Amino acid sequence: MIRYALAACGLLAAPIALATPHDTSDVNWTGSLASLNGATPAAGRLVVQPYVFYSETRNAFDNHGDRHRVTPSRSWRSIAVVTYGITDRFAATIVPSVSRASSAGQSTDGINSGDTSIRFQYMLQAPNADGTRAAFSLVAGHRFAVGRYDRLSSNGFNGGGSGVEGNNFAALYQQWFWLGNGRPLRVRANLGWAPRPGHVSLRGASVYGTGHGFVGAASPGSNVNALVAAEYSIDHRWGLAMDLGWSHDSQTSVHGFDGQGFAVSSTSGPSARWYASPALEYHLSSSVGFIAGAEFAFAGRNSAASVTPQASVVMVF
């Protein structure tokens, strides 16, 4: 009888043992290079993540997806992603940017300020202690056109902005999966959409390829993007990360008059690209981590076949 009673107690205890959360004290994450976090930081928590990007383009994909050589171009860009937890489920992020570019012996006259974005994130479902319950969030953002985009004199590289303000929206997912060796794999998925923002008036040389004396307007297209990402925690110091993403932009049109009064009308796109971003993570502590890797555009249409090494530090306060 005692033996059967003990067996019954064991069966009753089994679900409790299975439900015991995993130990996360030696697990640290920076996040992959491109994905957004499906969970918001705790109320009062500040996360600061500056990035540095170096992009080099020697090839481009044409309208049929074939790769061709183009005039080499290089650019440096830096952004700072600053996120603050307003409540445990609601967070705000601001993303300022600067850049420097060069091609065919011409370059920017110094460092250019780019557009600045803000976004707000609401977490619909919070993760549990060991991350095995998925986190889901919705994001709404806005881009402020603060970077130069036209009246660039004779140097078209001096433009760092788009000239248009626009909204963007995203749905985010994140979940941990504990492997047989006791280490976690964190998976993310992001789906984003930016509707067509409207038109922007242009004068002179601009980031849209217009020349000196041009007067007219540009109408940038909409964007749809998606990615999946995975991070593997090797130990409390090291981790591996990978993004696989896709982005599609609809047509951008430019119309107006050149410096001699002749009508000008052009359309570019639509464009698309597929990219992969492998990276390595290193953590000094639970509040400071580094990630470095590169983004490779391996397929696309009417887009650059660029390679973009990048690095970032994540600081949690």
Task: Mark where each language-model region is.
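Outer-membrane beta-barrel biogenesis signature
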Residues: L18-N59, N128-S137
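Surface-exposed strand-loop-strand hairpins of Gram-negative outer-membrane beta-barrel proteins
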Residues: P21-T24, F53-S78, F157-G159
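Short loop/turn motifs that connect adjacent beta-strands in outer-membrane beta-barrel proteins
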Residues: L36-R45, R89, Q125-A135, W178-L185, ...
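Residues on the lipid-exposed face of transmembrane beta-strands in outer-membrane beta-barrel proteins
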Residues: V48-P50, A80-I86, I118-L124, A140, ...
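Transmembrane beta-strands of outer-membrane beta-barrel pores
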Residues: V52-R58, H68, P96-S102, L124, ...
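Outer membrane beta-barrel transmembrane domains
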Residues: S55, N59-H68, L202, H212-F317
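Surface-exposed loop and membrane-interface regions of Gram-negative outer-membrane beta-barrel proteins
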Residues: R69-S73, I86-T87, A92-Q125, S250-T252
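Residues that define the transmembrane beta-barrel architecture of outer-membrane proteins
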Residues: R74-S78, D109-I118, A134, G161-N167, ...
